[in-house]
Design a protein with these regions (language model features):
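Short loop/turn segments that connect beta-strands within beta-propeller blades
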Residues: 34-38, 76-80, 114-119, 156-161, ...
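Surface loop/turn motifs at the tips and blade-to-blade linkers of beta-strand repeat domains
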Residues: 2-7, 44-48, 84-88, 124-128, ...
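Conserved beta-strand positions in repeat-built beta-propeller and related beta-rich domains
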Residues: 23-27, 63-69, 101-107, 143-149, ...
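Beta-rich catalytic cores
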Residues: 9, 51, 69, 89, ...
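Beta-strand-rich domains and repeat architectures in extracellular enzymes and scaffolds
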Residues: 3-30
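Residue-level detector of Asp-centered blade-edge/turn motifs that repeat once per structural unit
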Residues: 15-18, 57-60, 95-98, 137-140, ...
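Blade-level signature of beta-propeller repeat domains, shared across WD40, Kelch, NHL, RCC1
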Residues: 255-281
Length: 281
């Protein structure tokens, strides 16, 4: 099923505590909300030049999102009240185990933290030009992140202690990362056309995809216990089991980016061609 979004091109999508799907529209600078079965509602941001990208639910019942171009992290409540916080080039964002929101700062080689009261802290990573991109909360109580240009997956504790795990494949360019159902972290290697897995101890496994030029982008754990990913260049939705079995589905639209498990148990995908796609696992 395809839901057209006439107001812009969806980029990130996540499910909120209110049982709705929330999505970002990088252009024209807006946040959308969709209750399955109803019409989408779009809230234009002010200012609208920030380029909202990744969105995630917070522990406070609000949705938090990054504005990469605007150097802001935003918070929007179910009744569309928006608060913004200064942050340098934020991209990935996730709720941490400490009740704060954590984000990856692409241009400054930092991982940032925003508390519920707006207090912000940043931790400088031991790498220059690494381009922190995706971030996820691991089952081990730490945050895990990708360094796109450094070809590395990292781990940071809530106290800021960092460990880096370089990837075996040169030019892997990892982007999004998620906690898997097996206690490991899974990530998309957009440069190598692979899905990667790293254990809490740092053991890395890489799974080549059927089309190595597919540009895998986002990845989540689905309701069926498998990992689901978007293949941006081939307009496909992929599924990989924890044992490495892969299958892919053609999507009824182009340029898939973010994805989430919806309140209805389906996989919802943000398509930059101007739609949200619904796929039954």
């Amino acid at each position: 099923m395809l839901i057209k979004i006439t107001q812009g091109a969806p980029y990130g999508v996540a499910t909120g505590a209110d049982g709705a799907l929330w999505f970002t529209l990088t252009e024209p600078g807006a946040i959308g909300r969709l209750v399955p079965g109803e019409e989408p509602v779009v809230h234009r941001l002010d200012p609208a030049d920030g380029g909202p990208t990744v969105i995630a639910p917070g522990p406070d019942g609000a949705m938090w999102f990054t504005e990469f171009r605007g150097n802001r992290v935003g918070r929007i409540t179910p009744d569309s009240e928006v608060t913004s916080y200064e942050a340098d080039s934020p991209y990935g964002i996730v709720a941490g185990p400490d009740g704060a929101m954590w984000y990856a700062s692409m241009r400054s080689d930092r991982i940032g933290r925003i508390a519920a009261d707006g207090r912000r802290a940043e931790f400088t990573l031991p790498v220059v030009g690494g381009m922190p991109s995706g971030i996820a909360a691991g089952d081990d109580g730490a945050l895990w992140f990708t360094l796109n240009q450094a070809g590395t997956v990292g781990r940071i504790t809530v106290d800021g202690e960092t460990t880096l795990h370089p990837l075996p494949t040169e030019g892997a360019a990892p982007v999004h990362i998620t906690a898997g159902p097996d206690g490991a972290l899974w990530f998309a290697e957009i440069g190598a056309g692979q899905i990667g897995r790293v254990t809490p101890e740092g053991k890395i496994t890489e799974y080549p995809l059927p089309d190595r030029a597919c540009r895998p982008h986002a990845i989540i754990t689905g309701p069926d216990g498998a990992l689901w990913y978007t293949a941006w260049a081939t307009s496909r939705l992929g599924r990989i089991t924890t044992g490495g079995a892969i299958r892919e589905l053609d999507l009824p639209g182009a340029e898939p980016h973010g994805l989430t498990t919806g309140p209805d148990g389906a996989i919802w995908v943000a398509l930059e061609s101007g739609a949200l796609a619904r796929v039954t696992p």
